[in-house]
Amino acid sequence: SRTLFLITALTVISLSNIYSQPEIKAVFTGKAPVIDGFVNDDVWANAAVINELYQKEPKTGEPISEKTEFLFLFDHNNIYVGIRCYDDPKGIIAKELARDVSLGEDDRIQVIFDTYLDGRSGYWFQLGPRGSIGDALINENGKYFNKAWDGIWNGKAKITSEGWEGELIIPYKTMGFNKSSDTWGLKCIRYVKRKSETATWPATSINADKFQVSDEGKLTGLTGMTQGIGLDLIPYITGGFSKKKDADAAPVIDLGMDAYYQITPSLKVALTVNTDFAQTEVDAKQINLTRFSLYFPEKRDFFLDGSNYFTFGINGDDDDIKNTSM
């Protein structure tokens, strides 16, 4: 029984070490790396490095089968993420190039920043080997995933002789955060498609939700960050001509603007004047032969920004806000 107790104790200690919430301290840089997809600038040599990812599947808890490195730098205006995904170049699966497309059939990495360290919400960023990028808002500990959100950031990736690598530059102004705190929640994920392998930092359980935030690690040392005045202005102007029968053509000009002001880290005011919906993606046409209304996902940016704060209750698991077509 003493031997059994010792084995049990060692197992518990081992599992607690694997599933603990580790910390990594971000490194400030006075020189920004060039975002070209190659993680070869000298500044990356001083970056904070995460290289211990653990499989969620297929072999839960075991180290990732392919060497992987996530590197973190920051300055006063941006946070930078470098990625090195070592692999056989012939085995890399990378088909997509466009933004915000599904990379479910590609190799890819994902980074989640829980900027308020609440263990429930976060900003999700994705990068594929050929440079396809995607982003989303996470709420309700991964149950709410709003991929219609488009942040202001950029990412590049390249396939190399040793695998593939990439770089992200994310301005602080694209994310809300508490300036009085120097710590964010952080989760790093790599998918190796041909092996059906998912690996994360920190380690997570097989039963964890796909975008779960509560099992995150911590990114510390984030000081001296600038959010600016927190004011975003998005003006627009459209022009054309209008001609009526038996009348000369007359010019037509239409003006409008959306404005967003971040009063506090958790309070934002939105104002719209003569809202422009011309750039909004058109809903797919559907023929409705029933007596029930059709529901379409909300795609207008003005109504999407901050919408996750109004998602709760029975409908809290829905992926998108819905508007109704009568």
Annotate each PLM feature.
Residues 1-3:
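Positively charged n-region of N-terminal signal peptides that target proteins for export
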